[in-house]
Regions:
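Catalytic phosphate/metal-binding cores of nucleic-acid and nucleotide-processing enzymes, i.e., regions
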Residues: 1-125
């Protein structure tokens, strides 16, 4: 399964907002807007199929500027999205047995290409 999300992928864990009354933290508005748009994009443009068993994932992030970003933050956001949309049952290590992340810069372009293969299929690479 291969698909592309034409959005900048925000960090879920570094952009949290804390309720001062309760002390609970929540994902930021930017993250929630991205998540809602990404779910809608996937459901509109791709046939969502649940993948059972172990998988390997390749992520390619294209960044619109050269600002510093940690790759693992975007990775976590994408993994959570895959679970929330129903492609994966969980994002734990027993499901995602291996993942590969690459990053590149293209002025003014933000997107993430996601490739998912069953771990026992030999993968696309």
């Amino acid at each position: 399964m291969i698909f592309q999300l034409p959005f900048n992928t925000p960090s879920k864990k570094n952009s949290r907002v804390t309720d001062r009354r309760t002390g609970r933290s929540f994902p930021s508005d930017d993250y929630r807007k991205w998540h809602k748009a990404a779910v809608a994009w996937l459901k509109t443009h791709y046939k969502i199929e649940k993948i059972e068993g172990q998988v390997e994932i390749w992520l390619t992030f294209v960044h619109k500027d050269k600002r510093r970003k940690d790759s693992d933050n975007g990775t976590s956001s994408i993994f959570d999205l895959l679970v929330d949309v129903g492609i994966l049952p969980d994002d734990c290590w027993t499901v995602i047995t291996d993942h590969h992340v690459s990053n590149r810069y293209e002025k003014g372009v933000s997107c993430c290409t996601v490739e998912i293969e069953k771990a026992d299929s030999g993968g696309p690479r």
